[in-house]
């Protein structure tokens, strides 16, 4: 049976008109998929909703808030959800009493540290000596380490001792694989190589970050067509899903646009965006236009206590809750 779409109303008085219009465009596709009409209202308050509707709105607010963080603003958010069915005043009161508590609790939990930005590093054999406790003491919350590249090229610095040291220092740790699809190998074989080397080092524990597919410029030699490259990435993602029960994080940047044709399909994976620019609104591939990036790698020439020389630095908007959503 068809249902009348619910109405979602948002108040964001601290945003400019152009920001609001940009948010409206970004949210449209997502809310249409949920059959929820949305608009910016001059005022709004909470009328009551089912648990399911509250869940949907919290998801929408999460997207909106992450967009707001990119603009450096914190919007004031108010919600009105109306149901089309006719109810008596007593029924409405009962609905509001129960569901408003659920909604407010979820909203408080979702945004308790949403304005915070966490930082982290990623390393490889280019950083042969790392004092992980110094990295943690410098304020970083997470760290990624390269494990493998293609097949037959393990990272020479990655191993059991370093993998354990990352965790022992109190960092949320993650591992990444540098893809070599132009070599013509089955993506399943690269997943096998990646996870085999990771398992030799102790494997993934509960609370580690999801594994990462690093897909970026791999030179002209043997370059695949955009369609074949995307198909290869899809095969890698599906094999990780089959092996671990989780979608990996995808690390990419302008490569997704320039050498993959900027496809719309993000393979249902979070984005770790590489954008070494000072622009507060870096290019985000079209496939993630409605979610934006989860992690931003903003420089490959950063500095960090405990590491000699340059190191990649990353920002993760949304605080601890956003970090937790990327963990296995």
Give the ranges of each region predicted by the language model.
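Functionally critical loop-and-helix segments that line ligand-binding/catalytic clefts
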Residues: 90-125, 133, 257, 264-328
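Catalytic domains of cell-wall/extracellular-matrix polysaccharide-remodeling enzymes
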Residues: 208-286
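Short acidic, glycine/serine/threonine-rich helix-capping segments at coil-helix boundaries
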Residues: 6-95, 99
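Non-Sec secretion/translocation targeting segments of pathogen effectors
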Residues: 1-4
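Surface-exposed patches in mature extracellular/periplasmic domains of secreted proteins
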Residues: 35-42, 66-69, 175-179, 204-211, ...
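Substrate-binding cleft of extracellular glycoside hydrolase catalytic domains
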Residues: 113-243
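Sec/Tat-exported extracytoplasmic proteins
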Residues: 27-35, 58-65, 81-85, 139, ...
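Extracytoplasmic/secreted envelope proteins and their assembly/folding machinery
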Residues: 17-24, 51-58, 74, 78, ...
């Amino acid at each position: 049976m068809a249902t009348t779409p619910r109405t979602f109303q948002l108040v964001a008085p601290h945003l400019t008109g152009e920001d609001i219009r940009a948010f409206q465009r970004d949210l449209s596709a997502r809310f249409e998929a949920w059959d929820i009409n949305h608009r910016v209202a001059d005022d709004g308050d909470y009328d009551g909703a089912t648990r399911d509707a509250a869940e949907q709105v919290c998801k929408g607010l999460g997207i909106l808030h992450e967009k707001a963080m990119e603009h450096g603003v914190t919007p004031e958010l108010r919600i009105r959800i109306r149901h089309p069915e006719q109810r008596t005043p007593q029924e409405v009161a009962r609905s509001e009493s129960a569901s408003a508590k659920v909604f407010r609790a979820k909203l408080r939990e979702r945004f308790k540290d949403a304005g915070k930005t966490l930082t982290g590093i990623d390393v490889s054999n280019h950083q042969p000596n790392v004092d992980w406790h110094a990295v943690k003491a410098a304020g970083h919350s997470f760290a990624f380490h390269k494990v493998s590249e293609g097949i037959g090229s393990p990272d020479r610095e990655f191993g059991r001792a370093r993998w354990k040291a990352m965790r022992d220092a109190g960092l949320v740790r993650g591992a990444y694989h540098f893809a070599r699809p132009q070599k013509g190998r089955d993506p399943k074989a690269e997943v096998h190589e990646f996870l085999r080397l990771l398992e030799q080092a102790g494997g993934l524990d509960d609370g580690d970050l999801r594994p990462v597919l690093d897909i970026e410029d791999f030179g002209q030699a043997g370059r695949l067509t955009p369609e074949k490259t995307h198909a290869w990435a899809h095969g890698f993602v599906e094999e990780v899903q089959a092996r671990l029960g989780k979608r990996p994080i995808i690390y990419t940047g302008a490569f997704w646009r320039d050498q993959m044709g900027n496809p719309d399909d993000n393979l249902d994976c979070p984005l770790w965006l590489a954008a070494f620019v000072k622009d507060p609104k870096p290019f985000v591939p079209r496939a993630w236009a409605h979610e934006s990036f989860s992690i931003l790698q903003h420089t490959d020439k950063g500095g960090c206590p405990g590491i000699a020389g340059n190191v990649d630095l990353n920002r993760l908007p949304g605080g601890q809750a956003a970090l937790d959503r990327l963990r296995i």
